[in-house]
């Protein structure tokens, strides 16, 4: 985590307006993080980029999805502030490292209040979708700059959740979100951290093997597991990876995927000539999103999907 911390300190000390002056004119891109990361990953590890399905999402697409989610929250869920909503709900959650025979899973429960509109990007990448959500929410505070500082700490950061598997993307996401929040005038506390975690969204946990890096991974996994277990995610959005030859074959996600291998509303096997495509990573991320929305009893799933989603019979499942 020191890489993220040190990089963030460098950006805090820099005059970013001078750094960014003329950027778009020189690169024909408006996002410096994407410009850096695309070039870096293409040169450093193009095979990993292909294997992980890591591709740039056009800003216009990101803006459209975030704007649409905001409007649906207002129109269909009766939340006038949309993505900026501050309402809370009461939930019951398990307490880690507790044992209590009074509960079926052996864990003590506690009742807590948590924000209703929780956002999750399970394939965060460089943080483009979460950053766009921050920008759109900030626009709602036009002329109310004095309220922004308190709002971010109390009502925004606790609702922004992200999972990312690649260390480079994870680092860039933290830098981007720190940068965009600073640009809005927000001043972060020293002990404050973003809820973007280094983890595989399609797995349940990492075991701590004792090394310093493993301990770091364990802390990240614990943060992600808290979201997977206890957070009532209402909005799942992003651009998950596509990979027909998926390497994500963990027991948890494959068990969830069994629901997609049956004819709709039956227990009959899916009648598909080549059903292996249901195991594409993007299908698994759709199932992950459905898992969160189902658990919350309501919500929005807003992904950029492979075009085959609209063309293959498999998608009917």
Q: Where do the language-model regions lie?
A:
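Conserved small/polar residues in nucleotide/adenosyl-binding loops
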Residues: 313-317
